[in-house]
Amino acid sequence: MLIHWYPGHMHKAQREIREIIHKIDVFIEVLDARLPDSSTNPLLEEIREGKPCLKVLSKADLADPDITQAWQRALEKIEGVKTLAITTQQPGIAKQIPDIVKSMVPHRGMPGKPVRSMIMGIPNVGKSTLINTLLGRKIAKVGNEPAVTKRQQKILID
């Protein structure tokens, strides 16, 4: 007997991402700074098709700063991505994300040509908190249980 473990919502999300991949300029993957390797989506590399990626290590205040920096260096060197460690106590750090993303695709950062990013990550890594921080208001529902946000949303961030 062969048992498959691949929840339907994950399959649906992957299919939806593949349908809009051609519209995405930069991927923003949110990881938990306490366990970056365990909180990454192993399918992201395949899904993003070589497009630029910013890996945001959230909850950095709960992780060892030296280990977080080591993870950032490793991710940047091995995966060729940019990284940023953020905390909810210092929202100014997260507010750098739009400028970082624009620098990753300079041809899209011109007036009238917005950068189209996709924020993604496994449940409970801080995606909704990051969106709320970037917008400066609560637009994405936040909870301490997985799958509070169950669908893709289009949100304009300056």
Where in this protein do the model-derived segments appear?
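Canonical P-loop GTPase G-domain recognition
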Residues: 54, 60-121, 139
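Residue-level signature of catalytic and energy-coupling elements of molecular machines
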Residues: 32, 75, 130
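Glycine-rich phosphate-binding P-loop
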Residues: 117-142
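N-terminal accessory targeting/assembly segments
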Residues: 1-49, 139
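Switch I (effector-binding) loop of TRAFAC-class P-loop GTPase G-domains
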Residues: 9-14, 36, 135-158
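Conserved catalytic network of the ASCE P-loop NTPase/AAA+ motor domain
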Residues: 18-22, 45-49, 109-111, 149, ...
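Charged, alpha-helix-enriched surfaces in structured cytosolic catalytic cores
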Residues: 5-8, 12-15, 19-22, 39, ...
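Conserved, well-folded catalytic cores of nucleic-acid-processing
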Residues: 20, 34, 47, 78, ...
